[in-house]
Amino acid sequence: MTSPFLGRKMTAVAVAVACTTGLLASCSSSGTAASGNNGIAIIQTQQGSTANDIFPIVSGPQITPYNQQDFQWLMYRPLLWYGGQPGNEFGLYNQISLADAPVYSDNDTVITITMKKYYWSDGTPVTARDVTFFFNLLEANKNYWGYYTPGEFPDNVKSMQAVNAQTLRITLTRSYAPQWYSTNELSDLIPLPQHAWDKTSATASPGNYDETHDGAVAVFNYLLSQAHSVNTYSSNPLWQVVDGPFRLKSYSTRGDIDLVPNPHYSGTPKPQLKELVERPFTSLTAEFDALLANTGLTTGIVPSEDTSQIPALKAEGYTVFNTPSYGFNYIVINFNSPNAGYLFRQLYIRQALQHLVNQPQDVQYGYHGNATPSYGPVPLAPPSPYTTQYERSNPYPYSVSTAESLLTAHGWKVTPGGTDTCTSPGTGPDDCGAGIPAGKTLTLKILYDPYDTGYTIMMDNFQSAAHSAGISVQLSQGQFNQITAVTGVCSMGSKACDWDGVMYGGSTMGVYPTGNGFFNTNANGQGNYSSPEADTLINDTEYQPGTSYFYQYENYIAQQLPMIWMPWEQTGIDNVVASNLRGFTADEENPFNDTFPENWSFGK
């Protein structure tokens, strides 16, 4: 389930105690973490980063942890869940998957999947037909889907057949490496309640409309229209038919979301919470202040600038957990920007920009050591079998003088503290490059999310270093949902492409961290980067087993810089959990930022 926006999951699990004045009313501090509760757990979210899409076939900007891990996947479980199982963090999480492990045959062109016995909340069995329903809707509306890459899923499926209620057979257009296909393609399958959703209007009776292209389009458009009516989420009967551990009780556009256990959940364990509540905070500082004041939150996030207060939290009875999250951070640069697209298409400019990121300094002072450098497309922590020595070596270390030399060698008049200008237009080895006219200035506009103080420090440092090299970086701030909304595939000259760069916090990678969906042509949300060589190398990681092809891809992307690498804040290191929260192991040890509240309970 690798995704451009499944990255910075700045939610914290926060468990509320029942105070007589309300869920978040002030409670007196007793020197221990809040221990009384009424079975209500609160997940803290950031205003502007809350769930705003309930339909599991999501567009690119809607692929966020707030929509998926913290919302949709609690109600609509993926068929196969990869990653996050304690002790087997990079494998199939069999306990919460709705099917057994896929079986490959016929030279890895045929996949057979056996469904487990799960039921929808209305008592109807979850069957292979619910999977083909999802596939039919997706195939007919694939250009809407945020995970779609031409030639990949669903294009690489020749047929998908419900052999019987419990057996799904998928025939592929060619052989694929099973590890890649299972973790990056099959993990996208989400059974949908065909018996309740296969209709074209609120008054129509469910049928088999999805089995024709036009019918699938009509059903999809109806469901999408209902999903766009966010004010009706809790009252619309469509969204009450779920197979996950929770169902929706109430929803507000401000970000207040209440979920309650699905009493018909077929998986194990059964939810023991009375209610799961999501409440937005204006900032991490506001959340942390509430935590320190013991106002009802018994778990939360420690902002990077407040890590010195961890001993005080421990004295209050909290436990700190420190599992690294498996991701990397970056500035998305827009190769089709009317202002900067031709600049970004020059490797030497991308190299110069990367040399202006002082990652060791940002890790130490911006995040107080609570971050990992990003040097390429594979996370450096936790350790995995996919990281090469080349990427670990930091190919572009911080050096303002190296950045200046690169620009000078390619036809730029470098003006430290001023603004560099192109004085040698053209395509020769000493020229500025194609599309860059004489007099063009190195001026970039970058939008970023200031949710964590560390982000602002990091971006200010980058701006200052760029200024030293004569590059004008103009920074502006925006909320997470606002930023991700502007980063889709676009054409140069279109209004949708009128942005230079954004930084929203990075991405959590999947268990097999290939570049599909990130660095191949037409990848959603990643700045319109396109390289035939990258496409070939990414395809090789999909078709060929083993790691040698993967290492070639990784080294190429680390060298080519389709984005500007930035430090990845380790959100797992700065979390605290009250001692009376049970069943938190899967969340605590999960490097992929998943949430498993069906395991939670309260105890002494």
Residue ranges, per PLM feature:
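N-terminal lobe/hinge region of extracytoplasmic solute-binding protein
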Residues: 44-106, 136, 241
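Periplasmic-binding protein-like
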Residues: 55, 343-384, 394-410, 458, ...
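Aromatic- and charge-enriched surface segment that lines or borders ligand/interaction sites
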Residues: 100-145, 163, 169-171, 287-293, ...
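Extracytoplasmic/peripheral linker and loop segments enriched in polar/acidic and small residues
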Residues: 104, 109, 351, 363, ...
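Extracellular/periplasmic solute-recognition and catalytic clefts
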Residues: 138-148, 159-162, 249-264, 277-341, ...
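Surface-exposed binding/hinge segments that line
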Residues: 150-223
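Structural transition elements
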Residues: 246, 340, 373-429, 449-457, ...
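Ligand/substrate-recognition segments at binding pockets and active sites
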Residues: 252-255, 385, 393, 413-505
